[in-house]
């Protein structure tokens, strides 16, 4: 795992997403020309350095995760629901990205970018050794690099803080590590799409874009 810093004025993701409290609102912004311009600059200027390559393969647009204050999460992907009960398993959304039904390829590197200072009560946790979960205690302006295919990770189910946590996550690799030959025919789940397999989805011009500096 590595923590990286970025310029929040130059890459003003929080400003662009401010006041957006549902996934639909957030993704509308992320698909906008204004956001895409900032995103592509971030990829070309920052991620190429981190991946040590002038040619990289990166998720076209980031995924959004939202965890409102004083709420339980429905699951690891969706908006949260209001807390109505106690005693739920706080780790029941722990997963590896290689797990069924997502089957992310092993060449992916994960990046997680929260848009607030996070705490032990609203951050992502990573299983650094069996049954040992460590919080990613990042400040605004930092983002985490980790290998999500081999490491269990996820948020606690309940956000007990006063802070609404929005975060971006995205995956990619240096072009030299991108290898379509390892992709298989296993069916995968993609919201709004049908009949997709790993080798049809995790390729350039579908899930990924090719960036060259």
Which ranges hold each PLM region?
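Intrinsically disordered, low-complexity acidic/polar segments
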Residues: 73, 120-122, 177-179
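Residue-level signal for short segments within beta-strands and strand-turn junctions
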Residues: 68, 115, 128, 172-174
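Catalytic core of Fe(II)/2-oxoglutarate
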Residues: 130-213
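Catalytic core of non-heme Fe(II) oxygenases with the double-stranded beta-helix
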Residues: 77-147, 165
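Glycine/small-residue-rich interface belts in oligomeric ring/scaffold proteins
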Residues: 1-13
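A structural signal for short, well-ordered beta-strand segments
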Residues: 62, 111-113, 168-172
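Signature of the catalytic double-stranded beta-helix
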Residues: 14-100, 104-106
């Amino acid at each position: 795992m590595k923590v990286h810093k970025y310029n929040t004025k130059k890459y003003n993701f929080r400003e662009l997403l401010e006041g957006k409290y549902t996934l639909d609102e957030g993704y509308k912004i992320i698909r906008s020309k204004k956001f895409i311009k900032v995103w592509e600059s971030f990829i070309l200027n920052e991620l190429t350095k981190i991946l040590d390559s002038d040619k990289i393969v990166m998720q076209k647009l980031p995924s959004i995760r939202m965890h409102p204050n004083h709420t339980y999460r429905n699951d690891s992907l969706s908006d949260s629901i209001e807390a109505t009960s106690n005693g739920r398993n706080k780790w029941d959304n722990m997963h590896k990205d290689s797990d069924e039904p997502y089957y992310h390829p092993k060449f992916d590197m994960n990046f997680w970018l929260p848009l607030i200072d996070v705490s032990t009560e609203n951050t992502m946790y990573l299983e650094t050794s069996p049954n040992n979960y460590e919080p990613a205690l990042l400040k605004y302006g930092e983002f985490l690099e980790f290998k999500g295919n081999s490491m269990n990770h996820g948020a606690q189910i309940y956000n007990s803080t006063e802070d609404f946590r929005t975060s971006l996550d995205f995956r990619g690799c240096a072009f030299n590590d991108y290898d379509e030959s390892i992709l298989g025919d296993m069916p995968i789940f993609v919201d709004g799409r049908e009949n997709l397999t790993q080798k049809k989805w995790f390729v350039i011009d579908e899930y990924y874009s090719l960036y060259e500096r």
